[in-house]
Amino acid sequence: MSGGKGKAGSSEKASTSRSAKAGLTFPVGRVHRLLRKGNYAQRVGSGAPVYLTSVLEYLAAEILELAGNAARDNKKSRIIPRHLQLAIRNDEELNKLLGHVTIAQGGVLPNIHQNLLPKKSAKGKASQEL
């Protein structure tokens, strides 16, 4: 029996975060705290913050991947709000999810109505018919 202070005789292992246990990068503990403090429900289960964190991480990864592709298409190495806007609006499901979201400095999608485009030349059609 050791009477001194310290952890000389104990074999306690280092604590592992819930994010590491779930294989996530986003913080599970912070999401759990925000769920408790936000008055969304009286009690919060132990699996709810893990699930919500994984969903948030997946959405962030999806948007950042598409925005990175948009930045590369524009020959840029840095993602700007314009790239986020293009990524979200060109993806059908993300556009539906974030349809009412305004992105500051995002701009608009390039779109020209069909009636405003120049008409096809009549010479091209006539030569093909003969």
Swiss-Prot record:
Residues 1-22 are annotated as: Disordered. InterPro entries: Histone-fold (IPR009072), Histone_H2A (IPR002119), Histone_H2A/H2B/H3 (IPR007125), Histone_H2A_C (IPR032454), Histone_H2A_CS (IPR032458). It comes from the Eukaryota. Phosphorylated to form H2AS128ph (gamma-H2A) in response to DNA double-strand breaks (DSBs) generated by exogenous genotoxic agents and by stalled replication forks. Phosphorylation is dependent on the DNA damage checkpoint kinases MEC1/ATR and TEL1/ATM, spreads on either side of a detected DSB site and may mark the surrounding chromatin for recruitment of proteins required for DNA damage signaling and repair. Gamma-H2A is removed from the DNA prior to the strand invasion-primer extension step of the repair process and subsequently dephosphorylated. GO terms for cellular component: nucleosome; nucleus. The modification N-acetylserine is found at residue 2. It holds the Pfam family Histone_H2A_C. Gene3D superfamilies: Histone, subunit A (1.10.20.10). The modification N5-methylglutamine is found at residue 105. Keywords: Acetylation, Chromosome, DNA damage, DNA repair, DNA-binding, Methylation, Nucleosome core, Nucleus, Phosphoprotein. The record marks 119 as: Not ubiquitinated. The modification Phosphoserine is found at residue 127. Belongs to the histone H2A family. The [ST]-Q motif constitutes a recognition sequence for kinases from the PI3/PI4-kinase family. The nucleosome is a histone octamer containing two molecules each of H2A, H2B, H3 and H4 assembled in one H3-H4 heterotetramer and two H2A-H2B heterodimers. The octamer wraps approximately 147 bp of DNA. In contrast to vertebrates and insects, its C-terminus is not monoubiquitinated. PANTHER family: HISTONE H2A. This is Histone H2A.1. It comes from Debaryomyces hansenii (strain ATCC 36239 / CBS 767 / BCRC 21394 / JCM 1990 / NBRC 0083 / IGC 2968) (Yeast).
